[in-house]
Every structure is written in C-alpha cells, then in structure tokens.
Amino acid sequence: MKTLPKFKPFVQTCSDCGETQNIVEDYKNGYHVCGRCGCIVGNRIIDEGSEWRSFGDSNKVDPCRIGSASNPYLESEQLDTMISTGGGMNSYVLSKIQMKNSMRGPERALKHGMNLITAFCERSNLSRTIIDRAHYIFKNIEERKLLKGKNVEGIVAACIYIACRQEECPRTFKEISVMTAVQKREIGRCFKLISPHLERMATMSTENIIARFCSDLNLNIKIQKIATEIAKAAHELGCLAGKSPDSIAAAVIYMVTNLFPEEKKIQKDIQFVTNVTEVTIKNTYKELLTFKYDIIPENMVNKESIDKLPGY
C-alpha cells in the first residue's frame, strides 16, 4: 500500500544568523523580521484581518497599519532594513551612515531634491499632482545631467514653476521665489535651460492668475469676470506688451475695484497678494487708463463709472 509522504511544515529561517524560533511578523510594514539580528527574512505578507480607520485623535495611538507610499522615482526604495533615528545621538549617527552606504551619490542627490520639492509644495498647499509632476521633471533633469553644477534649490524651484504651469495652476516667478527662498533671477536661468527639453508647456497668461488673485482678495465673481474681460481686451490690443502677467493682473484688479466703490481695495492690499510693488501697479494702471474706453466692457460697466476712474 502506497503511503503518503510526511507533511513538513514550512519554517522561516534567517539567512544571516540562522535563527528559526524568534521570527517576528511585522504586519504594519508587511514582512517577517528576525528577532535576533533584525534582518528581513521573508517577502511581503498580507494581514487578512479587518482594517481600522483613524480619525486623527491625537490622544490615542494611530491604528493605521499602512506605511507611507513608496516613491516610484527612487530605485533604492525597496525591501530593506533601515536603522531608526531613535532618540539618542548614536542611533542618529548610525542611521546617517547607513543612508550614505545604502544609496549611491546620484540617488542621494535625487532624494534630497525630491524631499525639497515635497516640503516646498506642501508648505504652499500645492496639490499632489503638482508634486508628482515636479518629481518627474527633476528626475529627468538629474538623469540627463542637464543642469550639472547648478544650485539644487534653483533647479527645484524651476521644477515647481514648470509643474504648476503644466498642471494648469500657474504661479509667478515671484511666488515661487517667496516659496523656495531662491532668487527670481536664478529660477529664470534654470527655467531657460530646462524649457527646450520639455515636451509640453502651458502658456502663462494674465487670465490664469487673475481668478486666484481675486479669490485671495475676497472679491466677488462679478469683479473677477470684468477683470478677466479687461485683461483679454488689453492683450488683444497689445497695449501692455512686454509687461509681466502679474503686473498686468495687479493693475487690472486695481482698475476694476475703482469702478465699484463697495469693492475698492488700496494698493497695499493688492501689492501684498500679488507681490507687485505699488510703483509698478501705478505705472501699469496709468498705461491702462489711456485705453479705458476700449478695454472696459460697456455691457458690464456703465460709462459714468468709467469716466470717474482716478488718474493714479
């Protein structure tokens, strides 16, 4: 009579120290860990238990078992053992040494740049799509060595500027400069070197930023529509050719708020939101006044209000 072979249970064994008994199942991170030496033993495991939901109660331990998402642009983010920074100086030094040894020079530079992008964007409440787009642009630049020797902060700032334009949520050079503490001139230099190698680039128009500036100034939708129409008319006439979009937007908003006394804003308020100086707003506004009857839509504003516009 044919006998069945004896069943041999699967035993996890640490390949580093040979431990078989003290194998810990780490469900939060999804793998088995050797309790003696700390090395990862097996592949990722799945916890088949019920999932918990966390509602952000700071008084209790967060029950979420899911770690942070891995970055697809970093090759080093894979299954490995990391030394925690802990609370002591020794653990911090060991963690720093391990990070240097586990990542090659280019990977460390890539990770540093991506960390800066994430920090700057999250501080300014930019969306995740913009962060991912900036990561993608930065990785391409680093791999192709387009800006070798340039300041990392300048490259990061230019990547964020480009990502905002590509995702149709444009920011001005001044706004990116304030966000990253990088000079506007440096951002412009990096942008000029990167732009020829880009596949697509949305145009930076005044209409794109007027809506955001009006929202920051708590202006109603009517003011926003009139300001947008004036900006379009000024662009078609070419009366402000050579002026930056943020300067035109600031002057147009100042003009429209003067048409409606209940919505009037002083130049300092507009300067604070748009990062455009009062002198620039005043000079651009004076140039717009010359064409006020051509650019202000009469079907939305009566002629008397246009006649009463101040000269400065």
Swiss-Prot record:
<feature type="binding site">
    <location>
        <position position="37"/>
    </location>
    <ligand>
        <name>Zn(2+)</name>
    </ligand>
</feature>
<dbReference type="Pfam" id="PF00382">
    <property type="entry name" value="TFIIB"/>
</dbReference>
<dbReference type="InterPro" id="IPR023486">
    <property type="entry name" value="TFIIB_CS"/>
</dbReference>
<dbReference type="InterPro" id="IPR013763">
    <property type="entry name" value="Cyclin-like_dom"/>
</dbReference>
<comment type="subunit">
    <text>Associates with TFIID-IIA (DA complex) to form TFIID-IIA-IIB (DAB-complex) which is then recognized by polymerase II.</text>
</comment>
<dbReference type="InterPro" id="IPR013137">
    <property type="entry name" value="Znf_TFIIB"/>
</dbReference>
<comment type="similarity">
    <text>Belongs to the TFIIB family.</text>
</comment>
<dbReference type="GO" id="GO:0097550">
    <property type="term" value="C:transcription preinitiation complex"/>
</dbReference>
<keyword id="KW-0539">Nucleus</keyword>
<feature type="repeat" description="1">
    <location>
        <begin position="120"/>
        <end position="196"/>
    </location>
</feature>
<dbReference type="GO" id="GO:0016251">
    <property type="term" value="F:RNA polymerase II general transcription initiation factor activity"/>
</dbReference>
<comment type="function">
    <text>General factor that plays a major role in the activation of eukaryotic genes transcribed by RNA polymerase II.</text>
</comment>
<dbReference type="GO" id="GO:0017025">
    <property type="term" value="F:TBP-class protein binding"/>
</dbReference>
<feature type="binding site">
    <location>
        <position position="14"/>
    </location>
    <ligand>
        <name>Zn(2+)</name>
    </ligand>
</feature>
<feature type="repeat" description="2">
    <location>
        <begin position="213"/>
        <end position="290"/>
    </location>
</feature>
<dbReference type="Pfam" id="PF08271">
    <property type="entry name" value="Zn_Ribbon_TF"/>
</dbReference>
<protein>
    <recommendedName>
        <fullName>Transcription initiation factor IIB</fullName>
    </recommendedName>
</protein>
<dbReference type="InterPro" id="IPR000812">
    <property type="entry name" value="TFIIB"/>
</dbReference>
<dbReference type="GO" id="GO:0005634">
    <property type="term" value="C:nucleus"/>
</dbReference>
<feature type="binding site">
    <location>
        <position position="17"/>
    </location>
    <ligand>
        <name>Zn(2+)</name>
    </ligand>
</feature>
<dbReference type="GO" id="GO:0006367">
    <property type="term" value="P:transcription initiation at RNA polymerase II promoter"/>
</dbReference>
<keyword id="KW-0805">Transcription regulation</keyword>
<keyword id="KW-0677">Repeat</keyword>
<keyword id="KW-0479">Metal-binding</keyword>
<feature type="zinc finger region" description="TFIIB-type">
    <location>
        <begin position="10"/>
        <end position="42"/>
    </location>
</feature>
<dbReference type="GO" id="GO:0008270">
    <property type="term" value="F:zinc ion binding"/>
</dbReference>
<keyword id="KW-0862">Zinc</keyword>
<keyword id="KW-0863">Zinc-finger</keyword>
<dbReference type="InterPro" id="IPR036915">
    <property type="entry name" value="Cyclin-like_sf"/>
</dbReference>
<dbReference type="InterPro" id="IPR013150">
    <property type="entry name" value="TFIIB_cyclin"/>
</dbReference>
<keyword id="KW-0804">Transcription</keyword>
<feature type="binding site">
    <location>
        <position position="34"/>
    </location>
    <ligand>
        <name>Zn(2+)</name>
    </ligand>
</feature>
<dbReference type="GO" id="GO:0070897">
    <property type="term" value="P:transcription preinitiation complex assembly"/>
</dbReference>
